[in-house]
Amino acid sequence: MIVAVLVVLVTLGSVAFHMWSPWWWSEIASNWVGMDDTIILTFWITGAVFVAIGLFMAYCIWQYKYNKDKRADYEPENSKLEWALTIITTIGVIALLAPGLIVWNNFVTVPKGAYEIEVVGQQWYWMYRLPGKDGVLGTTDIKNINDDNPFGLNTDDPHSLDDVLIDADDLHILKDQPLKLNLRALDVLHDFYVPQFRAKMD
């Protein structure tokens, strides 16, 4: 009985903490509201499943607690239950995936006239490369990377000669300017995250 009560308290307490948590997202850019809507939809669907499973576990713990006069039934197959769970799971997966795929498609589709920026990660630091006056990012080669050339620029490429190199973590961008960010790293896997865009890429 105590275990069942604890399961109920943990389940409902987790939901309450999420609903009234002091930590929440930062303000999102106005053109990415659909991303937050998708995340909230995911919370509702997975939250409902979480509560249902938690309460069902508590019910089973209470209802089927040990009793020497009761014996468990052996039922290796139940086709009705299997079909019901398969259909419900399929509907849930579609409900989760469909909105996310739409938002993801909008996120990765580069609009015309997007300003191209290269983002380079290294432990524990970010660098940025912007096109110069010619408006074109020059080519790079990992073989060219050294202390004097951390971006690995190809000095034989005329487009590389006027690229703007920013050796700092912060990058300020123009308002209402579409961007295309090209990510690469000098060493290990990095996690690039812009909270205001909900943009997160490893």
Where are these regions (language model features)?
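Alpha-helical transmembrane segments of integral membrane proteins, especially early/N-terminal helices
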Residues: M1-M19, A48-L55
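Non-transmembrane, membrane-proximal soluble domains of secreted or membrane proteins
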Residues: A16-I39, I61-D202
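Transmembrane alpha-helical segments in integral membrane proteins
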Residues: F50-Y66
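Alpha-helical transmembrane segments
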Residues: D36-A52
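Alpha-helical transmembrane segments and their helix-start/interface "positive-inside/aromatic belt" motifs
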Residues: M1-V8, I39-F43, E82-T86
